[in-house]
A protein has these predicted regions:
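C-terminal catalytic/substrate-binding lobe primarily of soluble NAD(P)-dependent oxidoreductases
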Residues: 4, 141-370
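Conserved N-terminal Rossmann-fold NAD(P)-binding element of oxidoreductases
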Residues: 7-11
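Hydrophobic/small residue at the entry helix of a nucleotide-binding pocket
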Residues: 15
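Helix N-cap at the beta1-alpha1 junction of Rossmann-like dinucleotide-binding domains, i.e.
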Residues: 37-40, 103
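Conserved Rossmann-fold cofactor-binding substructure of NAD(P)-dependent oxidoreductases
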Residues: 57-69
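N-terminal Rossmann-like NAD(P) cofactor-binding module of classical short-chain dehydrogenase/reductase
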Residues: 67-76, 96-98
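Beta-loop-alpha module in the N-terminal Rossmann-like domain of NAD(P)-dependent dehydrogenases
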Residues: 72-88, 102-105
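Rossmann-fold NAD(P)-binding glycine/threonine-rich loop
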Residues: 99-122
């Protein structure tokens, strides 16, 4: 009988918890779960393939000791812990995967991966992550590319406040993507655009949405597509009116300069929800056989139960994407050394994976961007 492959997971929040459930259900992985919070770790039930370790990630020596001997470390922590975890993975020589959307953190991972003997694969979630894989797949079908617009959103099914929003994932991550510069391509040149700008609209299944620039979701596609496309952008999907309120909070009230306060305000006033939907909307236009063609990928993914526990759509999609990449790495289906970008991953391989199948539920769009 094959022994389970040892994996270290750092971060026992909602995404980390979902990753644990998905991997344990297979019986193929043994897990060391590391988190600084005893209260958070106490919620996990005993399992023969699960080892719980309470450890502050910032204690580098102890972190490296906890990570040593594992096939890979999966980081489901806030973006500001990425660098210390990635550096520890390099030191102990294990593979490294994370969910970060932060540009600076990813640049750090890219740099240290140059000397790595293992694989360093950041941005393994939904966006960046799956969105890059599906966008590259569509783009490969064109002879000449004109424009690419990538849109992703995790939204409440039943919005009931003036923000038309509920907290469905990391508050730190939301604030970061609303504040930091956004990499995009305009007129064939890579530029930095302001977050919350370039407001656009589209409809899907009879429901209207707004989209606007946010940071990080584009991943490494701006580099991969350099010189190949005239226009490339990544935008977040929200219900109409959300963007204007966030601009008021961040810019007019200057909470962009007081992010800890904004986080406190949001977490005390905006409820979380498990009743959410993840929207993925990618539109590519360009030439095929000398004809100008537009191709759109549209998908809605809903919350579901995993091991009898209801998980939100953003938890399911984010955790499943990382687990799929781990599986592909373990099976030798993607590069096993150096810096690995998401768009190198074959879409068919991803969707054929036991975890990636969650993305196979596709709903054709009944509207189009305008």
């Amino acid at each position: 009988m094959t022994q389970p492959t040892p994996i270290a997971i750092i971060g026992a929040g909602k995404i980390g918890e979902t990753i644990v459930d998905l991997l344990l259900e297979t019986g193929d992985y043994s897990i060391t779960l590391i988190d600084a919070s005893a209260e958070t770790l106490h919620q996990f039930k005993d399992h023969p393939l699960l080892k719980i370790v309470q450890q502050d990630v910032k204690d580098v020596a102890m972190l490296e000791k906890c990570m040593a001997g594992h096939f890979a470390v999966l980081s489901s922590t806030p973006f500001f812990l990425t660098k210390v975890i990635a550096q520890a993975a390099l030191t102990v020589g294990c593979h490294y995967l994370d969910l970060t959307e932060d540009v600076d953190s990813t640049d750090f991972v890219r740099e240290i991966a140059k000397t790595a003997k293992s694989a360093f694969i950041p941005q393994c979630g939904l966006a960046p992550g799956f969105i890059s894989i599906v966008t590259q797949h569509i783009a490969n079908g064109f002879d000449e590319l004109d424009s690419i617009r990538m849109c992703v959103g995790a939204l409440p099914l039943y919005p009931s406040n003036s923000l038309n929003y509920n907290l469905t994932w990391s508050t730190d991550g939301v604030i970061n993507e609303y504040c930091e510069p956004c990499i995009c391509i305009e007129d064939g040149k890579a530029i930095h655009a302001a977050a919350l700008e370039n407001l656009q609209h589209f409809s899907m299944d009879g429901i209207n949405y707004e989209t606007f620039n946010t940071s990080g979701g584009i991943g490494s596609l701006a580099e991969s597509m350099a010189g190949k496309v005239k226009s490339l952008s990544y935008q977040t999907i929200r219900y109409p009116g959300h963007r204007d309120i966030m601009k008021t909070l961040l810019h007019d009230l200057r909470l962009k300069e007081r992010r800890d306060l904004l986080k406190e305000v949001l977490e005390n006033a905006v409820p979380a929800t498990l009743q959410d939907v993840v929207l993925i909307f990618v539109t590519v236009s360009g030439k095929k056989n000398h004809h100008l063609i537009q191709e759109t990928y549209a998908n809605k993914i809903y919350s579901q139960q995993i091991k009898g526990v209801q998980r939100s759509a953003i938890q399911v999609t984010t955790a499943s994407s990382l687990c799929a990449v781990l599986d592909l790495l373990h099976n030798g289906q993607i590069p096993t050394q150096g810096f690995v970008i998401q768009e190198e991953i074959d879409l068919d391989l991803f969707l054929g994976n036991r975890f990636g199948r969650v993305y196979a539920i596709q709903t054709p769009a009944k509207g189009c961007p305008h």
